[in-house]
Amino acid sequence: MQKILSLLLLLCAFSAFGQGRLQLQVEDTQQLPLAGAVVHFMGKHYLTDSDGKVTIEKTPKGSYPIKITYLGYHDYEATLTLPIAQPYKIVMKETVNQLDAVTVVGHNPYVIECRLPYKVQVIDGFLKHSGDELSKILTQIAGVSMIQTGGTIAKPVIHGLHGNRILILNNEVRQEGQQWGADHAPEIDPMVADQISVVKGAEAVRYGSDALGGVILISPNKLPYGDGLHGKLLPSFASNGRKTTLTASVEGSVPKLHSWAWRMQGTLKRSGDLSTANYLLNNTAAREANFSVATGVQKNKGTAEVFYSRYENESSVFYGSHIGNLDDLLGRFEIGRPLTTYPFSYSINAPKQKVVHHLLKAKAFYLLPLGSKLTAQYAFQKDIRQEFSLRRMDRTRIPALNMELTTHTLDVDWDHSYRYRWGTMIGGSFSKQDNYNQPGTGVVPVIPNFASLSYGVFGIQRYSYMNWQAQAGLRYDYKYLNADGYDMYSQRYGGEHQFHNLTYSVGASHHLSSWIDVGSYIGLAWRAPHVNELYSSGLHHGAGTYDLGDETLQSETGLKWLTSFTFNNRKIRVNIDMYLQWIQNYIYDYPTGETRTLFSGVYPIFQYAQADAFFRGVDLDAKLPLLKWHSLSDQELNYELKGSVVFANEMQTKRYFPFIPAPRINQQLKWNVERNRGLVRNFAVGIGHTFVAQQTRFEPAQELVPTTPDAYHLFEANIETKLKIGGQQTLGIRLSAENLLNTEYKEYTNRFRYYAHDLGRNVFVRLIYNF
């Protein structure tokens, strides 16, 4: 018996010897501690203390993945081999208003960091805007606005450019839907993202064609390798339209297989008729159901991941935009509002549209010797769009437009970081696309069937030394397009087109001091005319317009020069972006002043044309602390200011282009209280004011009405708190109101401003539950 006890004691001693203690020190690049950073390690969560430290007991020997997250900072991910020198220091890099970083992940001593010389601006705390559409969320960034078709459909605008000139990367995949229409909102659930950011430069070299205005990055969080089960629940309610939204996500790693992780996410939305300050907008209800799943395996030398998402939206189109005869149409333009309204309803009736978008992505990367990384990614997308119009008898239930767009893309790139200062990326992409108009609609499609093939190759060289970062790149693209259809007279039309272009970019940034950064970037981007611009000939049901294309249109090429100045001393933050952009063969549509009469009504004719264009403007984003004090909690009062101005006109005639955003200013006054203990961890109150000037730079001959909407002021307010309700569970509560004074106004870039006013007061209640 005594021998057995001795043996057990000996085994216990060896077991205790095999387990150690891990001490971590988490700080920022200024060597300041980050309190409250979340450490994910071996399936559990830990929080750093006020000194940025955390101690994890009973850590056995071996290699384990670790992940650290902190609001406003890039996630830190690595693999720790224990035992390790302690305390182990971890440096977090800030994301908000900082230069983007391209880092090769791994443990190779030759890997260096290269910061790119253009701005990637990140939306801070976008989950507080759950339930909003992507375009509206993006307007939090200076220089980004939206072009609307009524109150339910919106597209983002960057520096005056929108549609096919804005490239959206949905989880690193080029979003390929029917984005050519002003009434075709991006088929993306923004709640799939952990971070939404905007690149304002003409990023054609890295991402390919269509990025003249900029790039929108929809980035989900990295899969939680080595983490335990956790998730979040985000219910919300909006008074305008009585809109309810519910988003839920859950994620984790497979027990005992920490290198295998997964995530599931879904969103449900339902809203009824929206309202202006004084009347309802009938037939503006919408429904949405989305979900996504992701899984992946992470090893020391590489990672393989699969992602799938399904987006479904059904939304009605305002009755008042479809008018029966010419006299009524002209009268509506003069009155500017519907003559008759009906009681509130959740019903979705024709005219309406229904969209289903599938996205499947498979990606893998492998870490090569000496700091290289090889990445391959394949993506499949299918976009199904149906638009319903008012028709005779029971034909209203048959879609008047029924299109299926199928896209296959393949991207391969090799990224290498040298030991001293240099980095290189070389890659290529291939895309195959087919658009098919389903027969049986009884209506001539607004665009013909088409097929396209495109490929591109690029090279980017980076340089980083001391306080200097620089980058230069070159890319070649080729696109083949074959369109084939029948017009309303049963005459076949279409043809083959080939486009190719060489694009380049060069830029540099300099860290003048610990407070000041200056960067300048110039890039040439291009895009081929889309099929709708070449061959449109029919009623665009969702927009309520009769569109006419021009098959002689040429490719657009745009040269953009962007210069940024940033001052940030951790108290005062000022960022100024100034840009000039020359676009050759700029394509735009404008109202001709004529109308076309169909069975369903009378519609204004919009014609596509092109001219050389000159865009220029300034964006301002500033934050000024007014008061700051410490007692039982950290309290501060801040003033924030955002503004943007963009001008655009033809180079030769100096005429103005339609639908260019008017100058705007947004200012916020925010009081924030932070606590590290107790039930209430955060409390904040804010008030805001937005001013939009009247757009005076327009051509009356290219407008349906001879004047533009008056300038307007909107006010908003919000109050929020964050509760610690046990363990790692938190509950955020946010109450906010937009258009607080219920102002009646019209937005120049809303294509339905001819028929009705914009939205009235809207009160939101949002919850964010993390578990």
Where are the regions that the model predicts?
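Short acidic/polar hinge/loop motifs at secondary-structure boundaries
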Residues: 57, 127, 173-201
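C-terminal beta-signal and adjacent terminal beta-strands/loops
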Residues: 526, 583-585, 589, 637, ...
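Outer membrane beta-barrel strand-and-loop segments of large Gram-negative receptors
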Residues: 397-413, 456, 548-554, 560, ...
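N-terminal periplasmic accessory domains that precede
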Residues: 87-91, 125, 134-138, 154-157, ...
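Short, acidic, small-residue-rich periplasmic hinge/interaction motif at the N-terminus
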Residues: 27, 69-73, 83-127, 163
